[in-house]
Regions:
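Conserved catalytic-core motifs of GNAT/GCN5-like acyltransferases
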Residues: 121-122, 138-149
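Short amphipathic alpha-helix that is part of the acyltransferase structural core
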Residues: 1-36
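Conserved beta-strand-loop-alpha-helix junction that forms the acyl-donor binding cleft
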Residues: 118-129
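A short helix-loop-beta-strand connector motif used in the catalytic cores of GNAT acetyltransferases and
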Residues: 44-56
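A short, internal acetyl-CoA/4′-phosphopantetheine-binding micro-motif in the GNAT/acyltransferase core
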Residues: 85-95
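Conserved acetyl-CoA-binding loop-helix of GNAT-fold acetyltransferases
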Residues: 95-108
């Protein structure tokens, strides 16, 4: 049975980097991204400030998916915002509402901590984009121009 819960994401950095992030990269960034190398210094600093959100999806205690996000004061307005960082679930666990449970867990935790909203991003045409289109308001469109080879 899949257990989705808020947890300490720093505990899982090695597992994510060695077991999950490369699968994630190959699925979503294979054409341009270089080798997976989590910026641990950044994650530790964000966590130390109390601004790292991490939801894990676990099967028999093993992490099979995750969603991470950052809390910060909006740079232009007087509110706390939450920015989605990463969302990944191993393909064999993408059944039913598993991915949505990760999203909802982050949203609940962000609201509990006082965030006014969560800004989500998704690859165009992905199933995640479809989920977001049904439950969120489209606000900005992000374009990526590659400047170096991955």
């Amino acid at each position: 049975m899949l257990d989705v819960r808020i947890d300490d994401g720093l505990r899982y950095m090695d597992w994510i980097e060695l077991q999950l992030a490369e699968t994630h990269r190959l699925e979503t960034e294979a054409d341009w991204a270089g080798k997976v190398s989590l910026n641990r210094e950044l994650y530790r600093a964000v966590a130390a400030a109390g601004n790292l959100l991490f939801a894990g999806a676990f099967v028999d205690g093993e992490l099979v998916g995750y969603c991470s996000a950052f809390l910060s004061r909006h740079p232009h307005y007087d509110c706390l915002m939450c920015q989605h960082d990463a969302l990944f679930l191993l393909p064999e666990y993408r059944v039913g509402m598993a991915g949505l449970r990760l999203v909802q867990t982050i949203e609940r935790e962000a609201a509990r901590r006082g965030a006014a909203y969560v800004a989500w991003h998704a690859k165009p045409g992905s199933s995640f984009e479809g989920i977001l289109a049904r439950r969120c308001r489209r606000e900005d469109v992000v374009y990526l121009r590659q400047l170096t080879k991955g």
